[in-house]
């Protein structure tokens, strides 16, 4: 005999008073993106993922350009506009801007989150394949150093 059980859960909705105070701080709305802007190169010279990245800013608009690793050399991805996020993870008490950018290469989609931590650009990359190739979707984190 299979017994069924009912699980009930109380969901608590957050009000502004429940949020991280940094999200309500007007200074968080004016964070600097200077540390993100520029050319970055992967710290792993043998990477099979992203070789380099350029982050540009025009007024309040961010553009991310990526060069992936290919058998014949670097593969330039289509440029993507990025959304600025408040990076609340503090480094020496300073908050900064992080970016979210999505890339559509037809055969795959890449969702990226970029932030600087201790002078290193950290990219969290979620890849989903769209080409029915049977390849596994994956999550990866890569690290980059500034190369201006």
Language-model features: locations:
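Amphipathic/hydrophobic helical signal segments and adjacent flexible N-terminal regions
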Residues: 1-48, 61-71, 117-148
